[in-house]
Amino acid sequence: MVATGLFVGLNKGHVVTKREQPPRPNNRKGKTSKRTIFIRNLIKEVAGQAPYEKRITELLKVGKDKRALKVAKRKLGTHKRAKRKREEMSSVLRKMRSGGAGASEKKK
């Protein structure tokens, strides 16, 4: 309801400008910070892949997407997490192929 300055009717009341409230801290709950993302990527780069992640990539290489999803679901617990992991591993595989193809051509 927007006040019109009239003292009768549905929109009665004094006209005021609404103050902009600062965002509440609970609105950023669950959102990963830039620093955390950077650190996680660094750790992934240094530590490499877990054995189950290697298995998923092997399954994706031979085109067994459904089996890869099942392996991921078994390890991670939920279908949603498994789908995200499968997509992550397939994107890693895609990057390796595109990066690897360029590197092998340069060697020749």
Swiss-Prot record:
InterPro entries per UniProt: Ribosomal_eL36, Ribosomal_eL36_sf
Coiled-coil positions: none
Keywords: Ribonucleoprotein, Ribosomal protein
Positions of region (Disordered): 13-34, 75-108
Keyword Cell inner membrane (UniProt): no
GO molecular function annotation: mRNA binding; structural constituent of ribosome
Domain of life: Eukaryota
PROSITE patterns for this protein: RIBOSOMAL_L36E
Composition bias type Basic residues, residue spans: 75-84
GO biological process: translation
A GO CC annotation given for this chain: plasmodesma
PANTHER family: 60S RIBOSOMAL PROTEIN L36 (PTHR10114)
Protein family according to the UniProt entry: Belongs to the eukaryotic ribosomal protein eL36 family.
Protein name: Large ribosomal subunit protein eL36x
Organism for this UniProt entry: Arabidopsis thaliana
Gene field: RPL36C
